[in-house]
Amino acid sequence: MRIILLGPPGAGKGTQAKLISEKFSIPHISTGDIFRANIKEKTPLGIEAKRYIDNGQLVPDEVTIGIVKDRLTKDDCDNGFLLDGFPRTVAQAEALDEFLKGINKELDVALLIKVPEEFILERMTGRRVCTSCGASYHIRFNPPKIEGKCDICDNELIQRKDDTEATVKERLEVYSKQTYPLINYYKDNGIISEVNGTESINEVFGNISNILGRDK
């Protein structure tokens, strides 16, 4: 089974990807992980990607596509894969389809985890992390016993820069601009399936499992 996972930042894609990977015995392929692995191994594509990242630039499509293609040729992808973080644009989606067609394969489903913006804002801006031990909390869903203090080591809890309202809104705007055309692309291809990401982890995964069971 070959799956694309779509959804806004904070939609719980990482959690669901892990569950899908385990249940269906397919590798969870995150573009971030691929970049880090290639940079660490100093592959030609990794060296090129690092050059852009070090200069604060977006890695061009041709480099990203090259790294993803290389990963998809590994033996563990023979029976399928779950792609997370790629494609991000229609151009990348078209390149992926062309590559798969060249090896007589195609995507089975593009899974979209739908979560309203206000829900994402509450989920992400409410996150707090301990400055000492790294324990995670949420001011509403998983609050510490004493406000602003870690239950484990009693050190200060902070909000990460990535979780400020301004940063979250900016990330959502980028996601919206990039991903809506991508959603329409997969709708036109007839392979998109949507799940409600505001439900519990188990409920979301149950719905995903039902969809993937139908598409097997």
UniProtKB/Swiss-Prot annotation:
Ligand binding (AMP): 31, 36, 57-59, 85-88, 92, 160, 171
Cell compartments where the protein resides: Cytoplasm
Region listing for NMP, in residue ranges: 30-59
Keywords tagged on the record: ATP-binding, Cytoplasm, Kinase, Metal-binding, Nucleotide biosynthesis, Nucleotide-binding, Transferase, Zinc
Assigned EC number: 2.7.4.3
Primary localisation category: cytoplasm
Catalysis: reaction(s): AMP + ATP = 2 ADP
Function of the molecule: Catalyzes the reversible transfer of the terminal phosphate group between ATP and AMP. Plays an important role in cellular energy homeostasis and in adenine nucleotide metabolism.
Name of protein: Adenylate kinase
Organism: Clostridium botulinum (strain Langeland / NCTC 10281 / Type F)
Source taxonomy: Bacteria, Bacillati, Bacillota, Clostridia, Eubacteriales
